[in-house]
């Protein structure tokens, strides 16, 4: 009998689904961030696109900070809109712009805690308060701050993404990314999605 037919949920049966080294990385980065769970990806942009596309559907609205890494802008402007997600960009440092942009169909707010490359700072707690009052999810790219300098989960983020290639790996010689959040989100929403989309 093939092992994958009888494997339990925590057994390793296929490299893309996980392995002991990746599981240890996920456990440790979740502990650093203060998140319930984590899911490692092949790159930081896989983490960003996986987090957003696993949460959003056609007809949803996203509010995003304008100051973003170029590839993040591409995902928001070109990929999500192609599938019927509407995106509104705001000055991430202006709380009133966030407030004005949120609508009844707003499903998520996305920003970098420290913007790449402008280094603008977004008030995670204040934006999270607005989002949660509207029933929206807060997705924070915390790559420049790292879990050491900015615990985004503790400040109200629901989902946190990292490029492990940069400051987490420390030298840029290996690619990686990670998505962190609640155990329910990671295991019931993100993990099945990422297992089948890469």
Give the positions of each predicted feature.
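Conserved N-terminal alpha-helix of the aminotransferase class I/II PLP-enzyme fold
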Residues: 2-49, 71-78
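Conserved PLP-enzyme active-site core in the AAT-like
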Residues: 37-198
């Amino acid at each position: 009998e093939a092992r994958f037919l009888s494997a339990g949920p925590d057994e390793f049966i296929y490299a893309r689904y996980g392995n002991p080294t990746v599981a240890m990385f996920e456990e440790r980065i979740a502990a650093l961030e203060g998140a319930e769970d984590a899911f490692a990806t092949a790159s930081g942009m896989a983490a960003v696109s996986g987090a957003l596309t696993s949460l959003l559907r056609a007809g949803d609205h996203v509010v995003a900070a304008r100051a973003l890494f170029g590839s993040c802008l591409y995902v928001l402007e070109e990929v999500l809109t192609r599938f019927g997600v509407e995106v509104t960009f705001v000055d991430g440092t202006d709380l009133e712009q966030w407030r004005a942009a949120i609508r009844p169909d707003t499903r998520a707010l996305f920003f970098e805690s420290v913007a790449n490359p402008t280094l603008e700072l977004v008030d995670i707690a204040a934006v999270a308060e607005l989002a949660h009052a509207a029933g929206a999810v807060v997705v924070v790219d915390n790559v420049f701050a790292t879990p050491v300098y900015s615990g985004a989960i503790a400040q109200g983020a629901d989902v946190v993404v990292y490029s492990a290639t940069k400051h987490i790996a420390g030298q840029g010689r290996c690619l990686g990314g990670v998505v962190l959040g609640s155990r329910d989100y990671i295991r019931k929403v993100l993990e099945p999605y990422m297992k089948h989309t890469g």
